[in-house]
Each structure stands twice: as C-alpha cells, then as structure tokens.
Swiss-Prot record:
Principal location listed in the UniProt entry: membrane
Role according to the record: A factor required for optimal assembly of photosystem II (PSII), acting in the early stages of PSII assembly. Also plays a role in replacement of photodamaged D1 (psbA). Assists YidC in synthesis of chlorophyll-binding proteins.
Topological category with respect to the lipid bilayer: Lipid-anchor
Protein name in the entry: Photosystem II assembly lipoprotein Ycf48
Keyword Signal: yes
Disulfide bonds: none
Location relative to the cell: Cellular thylakoid membrane
Family classification: Belongs to the Ycf48 family.
Annotated GO biological process: photosynthesis
Record organism: Synechococcus sp. (strain CC9902)
A single Gene Ontology CC term: thylakoid lumen
C-alpha cells in the first residue's frame, strides 16, 4: 500500500511540474494578421547571399554557385547575369556593395571584382596569395575606396580602386562564423566554434576578445540601429546589449519560441520592429522591444531556412535557401 501511495504521489508531482513548466516555455506564438513581405521564387537551387543597389530601382543579388541577378524595379523581378570567370571554378559570391555607380563583389575562393559603371562591366582584381583567409565582406566607401574583411578577421582598405590594399589590423581574429560592420566602421565577429566574440574599432591594431555570456555557443552577432549589439546563441536565445559602450553588458536571454529551430539573423525595420529569422521558415517580429512576438504568416509558409536580412534606406529582403527570397512590400499581404 505504501509503495502504491508513493507511486501515486510521484505521478502527481510529475503532472504538476509538467503543467508548471509548460507555462514557462511557449512552443508557439500568435500569427500576425498581415505581413509586409512578399515571397519571390528565384527558380534556382543556389542560395542568395547578399543584395545591393545603385539607386532605388537598380541593383544586384549574388549568391552561391556563381549566382548573380540584376533588377530594374526595386527587386520585384530579377534577371540572370553572368561574370567573366573560369568555368572550372564554382565561386560563392558572398558579398556585394555599391556606393553610387561604383561597386564591389567579394567571393570565395579568393575572388574580388570591381565595377565603375553601375555593374554593367566587372573587372577581376587578383589578391595577394598571402592574404589571410578568404574574402568575406566588402564595403564600398567612396570613389575608388573600399574596405575588405576576410573570414579570419583581417581588414584591408584601398583608396586606388583595388590596385593596392593597406592592412588595418596587425593580428587577425582567427576563423569566424559571422562578421558584421557598423556604419561607423567598427566590426564585430563570432569565432568559428561560437565560443567567443570579438570587437574592433577604427584606429585599433588588434581585435578585443570577449567570452560568451552563457554555456550556449554563439550563432551570430550584429549591430542594433543605435550602435549597441545583438546576439543570437544556440537554443534560440536572443540577447540585446544594453550598455552605453559596454559590449559585455547583455540582457537576459529572450526565447520567443521553442520550435526546435534556431535563429540565424536579426534586423530592425524603420518602425522599430525587431525581426528574427532562422530554420524551417522561422520569421518572427516584435513590436514592443522583444517582450512579445508574432509569427510572420508569409515566412511561415516558405520551405526554407532564413539566413540573413538585408535592410537599406529603400529596400528590405529576407534571404533564404535554394532560391527563396522575401521582399518588403509593406503591410498589404
């Protein structure tokens, strides 16, 4: 009898704990009544990786498998383009940026291209074989000027159209899984294993290393509109950097949804909405600083992981996989 009573008590305790825990963890969030995004099928198995525009109408999209597309209507439609590259090399075009009519493309392995006529013609620039790492991020800075960052945190700048490059750091950060640049020229990166992040400010010669704030490995990191940082860790954890200039002051973990898929990128829209994108069509938005979240109904229907947001003054895109792309059209969908 005592054994039976003990078993019943244990079962009741398990049920109580289960109910209690289910109130702390949400497996679903409400679905928004409308979406500002429109799905575009690029009809390719390549992954779109970056977008940049010469003006509000004309721009380019680049991606894996040498993919380059051109638009003349703000990104509603994309047409195939090609680059004069060796057929035997399957380049991954990872970054593109324009300043007016001058544009740059960075790719892997060892690819850098330059245009001075709005992308109608591209010239390949051959990089020094001693360049640390592979090109990862290119930023157009003005006439004949650009900044190149590699996947080991080396940063180089040119002021002569890419004929020569000057190193900005004396010691690279090591292999990175994510690297972002702010509008003022600062950089932040996540180490290849996700066990620490590093920051670099213009004028400094080395990266500053910072340990992660929890046992969860870091996935990605970037800049909020006010210059503070955001962080995404494994386990679908979001943290926001609250300190004024203190890059080690982080909020408690925000876990909007536990659907088994992590987040890969974040972005802020012009109205202050916070967007998080990730695996299996996960696309969430918060309109109250991260306190509550909604699922985007268009993103939820896409058979793709969302890997990156691209926002500029006139456009916004969510980049997926296998030709999946979302374009911002406003709250009309």
């Amino acid at each position: 009898m005592n054994r039976l009573l003990s078993s019943a008590v244990n079962l009741l305790l398990v049920l109580v704990l289960g109910v209690g825990l289910s109130g702390c963890v949400s497996t679903r969030v409400p679905t928004a009544s409308s979406s500002p995004w429109k799905a575009i099928d690029l009809e390719t198995q390549a992954n779109p990786l970056d977008v940049s525009f010469t003006d509000p109408s004309h721009g380019f999209l680049v991606g894996s498998n040498r993919m380059i597309r051109e638009t003349d209507d703000g990104g509603a439609h994309w047409n195939d383009r090609s680059l004069d590259l060796p057929d035997e090399e399957n380049f991954r075009l990872i970054s593109i940026d324009f300043e007016g009519q001058e544009g740059w493309i960075a790719g892997q392995p060892g690819l850098l291209m330059h245009s001075t006529d709005g992308g109608q013609n591209w010239t390949r620039l051959f990089l020094d074989t001693k360049l640390p790492g592979e090109p990862y991020l290119i930023t157009a800075l003005g006439k004949s000027s650009a900044e190149l960052a590699t996947n080991v945190g080396a940063v180089y700048k040119t002021n002569d159209g890419g004929e020569s490059w000057e190193a900005s750091v004396t010691d690279a950060a090591g292999a990175v899984r994510d690297l972002r640049r702010s509008s003022n020229g600062s950089y932040v990166s996540v180490s290849g294993l996700g066990n620490f992040y590093a920051t670099w400010e213009p004028g400094e010669t080395v990266w500053k290393v910072h340990q992660r704030v929890s046992s969860q490995r870091l996935q990605s990191i970037g800049y909020q509109p006010d210059g503070n940082l955001w962080m995404v860790a494994r386990g679908a954890q979001i943290r926001l950097n609250d300190g004024d200039g203190n890059v080690e002051d982080w909020s408690k973990a925000i876990i909007p949804i536990t659907n088994g898929y992590g987040y890969m990128d974040m972005a802020w829209d012009d109205d202050g909405g916070i967007w998080a994108g990730g695996g299996n069509g996960t696309l969430l938005v918060s309109h109250d600083g991260g306190d509550s979240w909604e699922t985007d109904p268009v993103g939820d229907q896409q058979p793709s992981n969302f890997t990156r947001f691209v926002f500029d003054d006139d456009h916004a895109f969510v980049l997926g996989e296998r030709g999946n792309l979302l374009r911002w059209v406003g709250n009309a969908v």
